């Protein structure tokens, strides 16, 4: 019984240390989440302004814009930019989006020639590699608050491949941050660019004279616009990642406390049984005398 008591005490001590670690990780993730949410809100304001200006420019002429970035073409190949984390300990953050992507690929495509994948995040890259799914581009090791410079390579690669007609449409697959408890797996079509959901207000640029002409401006602006929208998805996904990490560590801490309580009850019962047995043996010995 003594050895059993010692084993339980060791488990309790070990679990307490684990709960301290997960509790600290929860606090770190909470701090990262707060910064990420501020970053995401600031970018959203910028993105809305850019979208309005771009929409006004596209709509500033009676003739529809003829830029290749906006023209729908026959879809022979689809590009998927899949955003995951580099590390684990984020609950179902990675599995949700990866499962969604794989289900979509199975439904839409007959073979590998019909799609290509760009992976942002080590978890996604390793996931596809383990399943012999070809990945055309991989970017790992993003910081907790990624700047555009960090992701410029993969974002530019996605836009460049589309412009070169290596694929005919691009979907960005990521977890959208709703709140600290909820994220939503999304698969957003980024290319070709569409402004169909824009409001019906009269464009504010139609009274302006554009220099150089509208098409020349759009040739420069639309690729940058697409890159900024993709970057916005990355910022959003990173925020969801921090929220998932915080939730996972909070759950782990709560589970550790529950285990400690159960072990403490088990320890007290075992100790009580040990004491009862000792008393019984003493009484039996005294009676024998």
From Swiss-Prot:
Choose any GO biological process term that the UniProt entry carries and state it.
proton motive force-driven plasma membrane ATP synthesis
Q: Which domain of life is it from?
A: Bacteria
Q: Which GO terms describe its cellular component?
A: plasma membrane; proton-transporting ATP synthase complex
Q: What keywords is this UniProt entry annotated with?
A: ATP synthesis, Cell membrane, CF(1), Hydrogen ion transport, Ion transport, Membrane, Transport
User: What CDD domains does the database record attribute to this sequence?
Assistant: F1-ATPase_gamma
Check the record and name the SUPFAM superfamilies matching this protein.
ATP synthase (F1-ATPase), gamma subunit
Membrane topology per record: Peripheral membrane protein
**What would be an example GO MF term here?**
ATP binding
Q: Which residues cross the membrane?
A: none
Compartments it resides in? Cell membrane
Q: Which family does it belong to?
A: Belongs to the ATPase gamma chain family.
Task: Please describe what this protein does.
Answer: Produces ATP from ADP in the presence of a proton gradient across the membrane. The gamma chain is believed to be important in regulating ATPase activity and the flow of protons through the CF(0) complex.
Subunit structure of this chain's protein: F-type ATPases have 2 components, CF(1) - the catalytic core - and CF(0) - the membrane proton channel. CF(1) has five subunits: alpha(3), beta(3), gamma(1), delta(1), epsilon(1). CF(0) has three main subunits: a, b and c.
Quote the protein name from its UniProt record. ATP synthase gamma chain
**UniProt gene name:** atpG
């Amino acid at each position: 019984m003594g050895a059993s008591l010692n084993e339980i005490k060791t488990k309790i001590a070990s679990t307490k240390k684990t709960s301290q670690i997960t509790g600290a990780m929860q606090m770190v993730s909470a701090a990262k989440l707060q910064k990420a949410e501020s970053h995401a809100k600031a970018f959203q304001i910028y993105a809305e302004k850019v979208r309005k200006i771009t929409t006004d420019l596209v709509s500033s002429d009676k003739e529809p814009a003829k830029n290749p970035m906006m023209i729908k073409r026959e879809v022979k190949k689809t590009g998927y930019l899949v955003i995951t984390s580099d590390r684990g300990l984020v609950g179902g953050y990675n599995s949700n989006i990866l499962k969604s992507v794989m289900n979509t690929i199975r439904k839409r495509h007959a073979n590998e020639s019909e799609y290509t994948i760009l992976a942002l995040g080590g978890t996604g890259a390793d996931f596809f590699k383990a399943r012999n799914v070809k990945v055309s581009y991989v970017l790992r090791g993003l910081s907790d608050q990624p700047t555009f410079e960090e992701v410029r390579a993969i974002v530019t690669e996605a836009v460049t491949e589309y412009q070169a007609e290596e694929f005919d449409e691009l979907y960005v697959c990521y977890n959208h941050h709703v709140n600290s408890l909820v994220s939503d797996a999304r698969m957003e079509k980024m290319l070709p660019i569409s402004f169909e959901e824009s409001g019906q207000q009269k464009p504010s640029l139609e009274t302006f004279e554009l220099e150089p002409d509208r098409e020349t401006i759009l040739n420069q602006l639309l690729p940058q616009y697409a890159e900024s929208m993709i970057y916005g998805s990355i910022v959003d996904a990173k925020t969801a990642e921090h929220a998932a990490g915080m939730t996972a560590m909070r759950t782990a801490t709560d589970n550790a406390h529950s285990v400690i309580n159960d072990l403490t009850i088990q320890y007290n019962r075992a100790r009580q049984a040990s004491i009862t047995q000792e008393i019984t043996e003493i009484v039996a010995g005294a009676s024998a005398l």
